[in-house]
Amino acid sequence: MYKSSENINRFTEEIENTFWDDLEKFNFEKIKREVANLKKEYFSFEDYNIFIKILKRLKADKRKNVNGLYLNFYKFLLNQKKEIERVRQMYNFDKYFGNYIYVAGTDEVGRGPLAGPIVAAAVILNLNYVEDKKLILGVKDSKKLTQKARYELSQTIKEKALSYSIAVINNKEIDKRGISWCNNEVLRKAVLGLKLPVELVLSDGYAVKNLPVRNEFVIKGDSKSVSIASASIIAKVYRDELMREYSKVYTEYNFQSNSGYGTKEHIGAIKKYGTCKIHRLSFLRNIV
């Protein structure tokens, strides 16, 4: 793996000076592994000349299976270019609102479930990226990602964020205050939990009340804003993990699968076993 800048530079030297110039000396499996490593680590189109060299070597090789790697890698680069352009647009969207240094995106998950808390996250990213390598590729609306992709992106976002914050309001408070108040409050708490002086808050769908800084709401923000999408991913992963832990205590309700939402199976379990300590009783008046 070529994670550090030192390793990236060394890998670049290897590409330019050894392996790809002597491709015929290596067997197919070795070449296949090297192409796979490129896909994992080497996606920046600032390295365009290196990619062209590799493609030419793969295409010129006399082995058909190596030529197949050329087509595979070429398609990968085209898709990667589209992804870089898509994510660039999401970064640029957040920069459009003004010359701010610290822009926070915030989003919540868990407004509608019958059980468990509502969770929000707020994220500040470095929007002034210099290289494509600095972009968080793959970021999008958390609902459009697989569980595995969400988890991996959540880890990457936390590592690259300038600051992030997670806020939680439990089911008891939801029953006491109502979901609308809790929805706003959990977003507000997430923003106020950031460790940097926020200048602008971008929120998904509607404004967050009682914030001390400028707030712009964005319709379908988790598809347009990199900061909102990042917050959406962190919040979703955090809540899903929490519900999996609850499922170990309250085994009857299959929380690890339904995350507390009102699936047919979940409602059936409530009718059979009654409620547990994390159910939102105010949501169950027509069920129990």
From Swiss-Prot:
Keyword Transferase recorded: no
Keyword Cytoplasm: yes
Residue numbers binding a divalent metal cation: D107, E108, D204
Organism annotation: Clostridium kluyveri (strain ATCC 8527 / DSM 555 / NBRC 12016 / NCIMB 10680 / K1)
Lineage: Bacteria, Bacillati, Bacillota, Clostridia, Eubacteriales
Cofactor: Mn(2+); Mg(2+)
Enzymatic reactions: Endonucleolytic cleavage to 5'-phosphomonoester
Function: Endonuclease that specifically degrades the RNA of RNA-DNA hybrids.
Listed EC numbers: 3.1.26.4
Subcellular location: Cytoplasm
Superkingdom field: Bacteria
Predominant location: cytoplasm
Protein name: Ribonuclease HII
